[in-house]
């Protein structure tokens, strides 16, 4: 009976420790995610100040064959690329939280799966493409990768496109490069 009591006490202590450890992990993870989201918002505010207020003036391109004239770009690519030369474009989707730099590593296709624009570990990672895609978006298909974060960052708000009314009112994705603005029409939204 005494051995059984010691065993039960040890089991209870172990369970309590596991619960405390799990709760601590969840709290720290949520704090880190929220800090990362604030950092991402600061990046958008610092380097892409002209996008959300409708003052975008970069040349709009919908086809590579169109001749374009270069005008002022709302994205400060010079400052961004001083931070990290892997930053090559910016994606913005109105009425979502998607307003981020796009990166591509020349060494590791999935580096930015779990690294921020400063190449530090980041649970939410960054928006990125792999080396098989050209940085000028001249490929027939360019795949951009990003997490579906519970805190609403990265590509989490793309779920809004499941709502037909939202979909019909928000039909465009804007991608900025240092020399042009590309506009893509959203023709379908589905869960993969």
Located regions from the model:
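Hydrophobic membrane-insertion alpha-helices, especially the h-region
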Residues: 10-25
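Solvent-exposed, non-transmembrane regions of membrane-associated and secreted proteins
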Residues: 21-192
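N-terminal Lys/Arg-rich, disordered targeting/topogenic segments
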Residues: 1-5
């Amino acid at each position: 009976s005494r051995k059984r009591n010691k065993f039960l006490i040890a089991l209870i202590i172990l369970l309590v420790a596991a619960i405390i450890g799990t709760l601590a992990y969840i709290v720290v993870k949520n704090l880190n995610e929220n800090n990362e989201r604030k950092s991402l918002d600061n990046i958008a505010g610092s380097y892409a100040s002209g996008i959300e207020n409708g003052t975008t003036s970069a040349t709009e391109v919908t086809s590579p064959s169109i001749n374009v004239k270069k005008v002022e770009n709302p994205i400060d690519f010079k400052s961004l690329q001083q931070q990290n030369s892997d930053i090559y474009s910016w994606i913005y989707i109105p009425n979502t939280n998607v307003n981020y730099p796009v990166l591509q590593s020349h060494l590791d296709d999935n580096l930015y799966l779990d690294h921020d624009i400063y190449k530090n570990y980041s649970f939410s990672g960054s928006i990125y493409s792999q080396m098989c895609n050209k940085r000028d978006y001249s490929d027939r298909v360019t795949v951009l990768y990003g997490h579906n974060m519970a805190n609403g960052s990265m590509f989490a708000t793309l779920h809004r496109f499941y709502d037909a009314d939202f979909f019909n009112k928000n039909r465009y994705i804007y991608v900025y490069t240092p020399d042009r603005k590309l506009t893509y029409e959203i023709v379908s939204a589905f869960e993969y």
